[in-house]
Amino acid sequence: MAETKATLTNRLLAVKHNSGKSYSEIAEETGLTNVYVAQLFRRQAQLKPDTALKLRAVLPELSDELLGEMMRPPMRSYDPNLIQEPSVYRLNEAVMHFGESIKEIINEEFGDGIMSAIDFYCSVDKVKGVDGKDRVVVTFDGKYLPYSEQKTEHMVSRLRQNGN
């Protein structure tokens, strides 16, 4: 019987927990962002073969079976109840509150388009504010993707239908 995503995720998180290492420590040792490392352990990202060797060196408890599962394309999904978790709720609230302004600035700086969440890097960092208190820095670093003008002459499917 196939293992569920939740069961596999729990096994992966147990390996991380047993290592005593944080996502940021694993990230530093593998050359990945801390959020990407968390995505790997939550089966939201695919582990690439060259990175698998680095991850195994950092976490020797990862079995060949677990590494193999991490290298399979994941089912990227989330629990809809996750929004009720306070940190996730506040992050969503911040994006929704600032979203329209961020969109306008993207349009001013780049033109009509979006920030990719595919060619995308994300990290979470801890810094001290000017008042000496801890602050959370969430960085979204995504490739700019312009919207295409939909000209029929560029529509490959239509070109093929017309014998071109």
Swiss-Prot record:
Gene3D superfamilies: Cyanate lyase, C-terminal domain, lambda repressor-like DNA-binding domains. HAMAP family: Cyanate_hydrat. It is an enzyme of class 4 (lyase). Catalyzes the reaction of cyanate with bicarbonate to produce ammonia and carbon dioxide. The active site is at residues 90, 93, 116. Its EC number is 4.2.1.104. Pfam families: Cyanate_lyase. Keywords: Lyase. It catalyses: cyanate + hydrogencarbonate + 3 H(+) = NH4(+) + 2 CO2. The lineage of its organism: Eukaryota, Viridiplantae, Streptophyta, Embryophyta, Tracheophyta. NCBIfam families: cynS (TIGR00673). This is Cyanate hydratase. GO terms for biological process: cyanate metabolic process. Belongs to the cyanase family. GO terms for molecular function: cyanate hydratase activity; DNA binding. The keyword Lyase applies.
